[in-house]
Amino acid sequence: MFILASQSPRRQALLKRVVNDFEVQPAQIDEHETPLTAPGDYVQTLAQRKGEAVAVQYPTATILAADTAISFQGTLYGKPKDRQDAYEMLRQLSGQTHQVYTGLWLMKDGLVQQKVVQTDVTFWHLSTAEIEQYLDQNEYADKAGAYGIQGAGALLINKVNGDFYNVVGLPVSTVARMLQN
């Protein structure tokens, strides 16, 4: 049995590229209980907490848990609270390079592997009108950093250095290699 410990539709779609048959079992944890640390450590800790929470219920299953966050100049960006919060995030990221981190936790045959994948993303310089036009698409609400690279958010991006799918939410090639080990 293979379990994805995430309810993210993007992670589910990406995992299908690597695993044919899996179940979705979101972890029931309070993410706010995880102290803010360095971005890579933060996402790794959250992925571990999610994976371990599901492993208690399914100790013999293969379980994949992941968490993604955006970091810019030492600040972690999660999902925006509202449109104004999303506007501020995008304004701050405009013309800048930020980092997207995904922590991965995989339990297979009772053994645990953990990895953190980092991708650098550079935004174009965005006008107020461009930001407002993007926000009008209403795809920002459930996305860290207030954008989705796989949707209209692609128009905001000048350059990606690293794994594109990491920015979507699941670094597929890294997951495939972890599963081979």
From Swiss-Prot:
GO terms for biological process: nucleotide metabolic process. One of its GO terms (molecular function) is dTTP diphosphatase activity. Its cofactor is a divalent metal cation. The keyword Cytoplasm applies. Its main location: cytoplasm. InterPro entries: ITPase-like_fam, Maf-like. The keyword Cytoplasm applies. It comes from the Bacteria. The record marks 10, 68, 150 as: Important for substrate specificity. Its EC number is 3.6.1.9. GO terms for cellular component: cytoplasm. The active site is at residue 67. It catalyses: dTTP + H2O = dTMP + diphosphate + H(+); UTP + H2O = UMP + diphosphate + H(+). It is found in: Cytoplasm. Pfam families: Maf. Transmembrane segments: none annotated. Nucleoside triphosphate pyrophosphatase that hydrolyzes dTTP and UTP. May have a dual role in cell division arrest and in preventing the incorporation of modified nucleotides into cellular nucleic acids. HAMAP family: Maf. Belongs to the Maf family. YhdE subfamily. This is dTTP/UTP pyrophosphatase. It comes from Latilactobacillus sakei subsp. sakei (strain 23K) (Lactobacillus sakei subsp. sakei).
